[in-house]
Amino acid sequence: VDLTAEEKAAVLALWGKVNEDEVGGEALGRLLVVYPWTQRFFDSFGDLSTPAAVLGNAKVKAHGKKVLHSFGDGVHNLDNLKGTYAALSELHCDKLHVDPENFRLLGNVLVVVLAQHFGQEFTPELQAAYQKVVAGVANALAHKYH
């Protein structure tokens, strides 16, 4: 990811304040509501029939937590995203057959959730840096597909 030293510092500083457990569930839940076709990858999660059901679903929250912890690994390894996500890229490509576009969608949803949580602190400059990070993570996760 092509970030300046200042952008890296800002990304890491904000990430230190992120409640990964809470934000992960919100981000995955929002993805499943805003882009309902992504629900097909989560058949085992039970009731996803309404936004309230999705957002209140314990399995969505638990998997969102797992996803965000993994994203945090990337935030702390910005210079080696492909290496950080090599195994997950292979899993999502070969076994789960997830459309890599979904990684981009989730990244964009995560930026929205961060903006909600941090309000004025999530400046346009910080958003721009996070957009670079989520794009880098999405590209790393899609690496096996190429």
Curated annotation (Swiss-Prot):
GO biological process, alphabetically ordered: hydrogen peroxide catabolic process
Gene3D superfamilies listed in its UniProt record: Globins
Expression by tissue: Red blood cells.
Modified residues (Phosphoserine): S44
Sorted UniProt keywords: Acetylation, Heme, Iron, Metal-binding, Oxygen transport, Phosphoprotein, S-nitrosylation, Transport
Domain spans labelled Globin: 2-146
CDD domains recorded: Hb-beta-like
Keyword presence, DNA damage: no
N6-acetyllysine, modified sites: K59, K82, K144
Residues reported in the UniProt entry to bind heme b: H63, H92
PROSITE patterns: GLOBIN (PS01033)
N-acetylvaline modified-residue sites: V1
GO molecular function, one term: oxygen carrier activity
S-nitrosocysteine: modified positions: C93
InterPro entries documented for this protein: Globin, Globin-like_sf, Globin/Proto, Hemoglobin_b, Hemoglobin_oxygen_transport
Family designation: Belongs to the globin family.
Subunit annotation: Heterotetramer of two alpha chains and two beta chains.
Listed name of the protein: Hemoglobin subunit beta
Lineage start: Eukaryota, Metazoa, Chordata, Craniata, Vertebrata
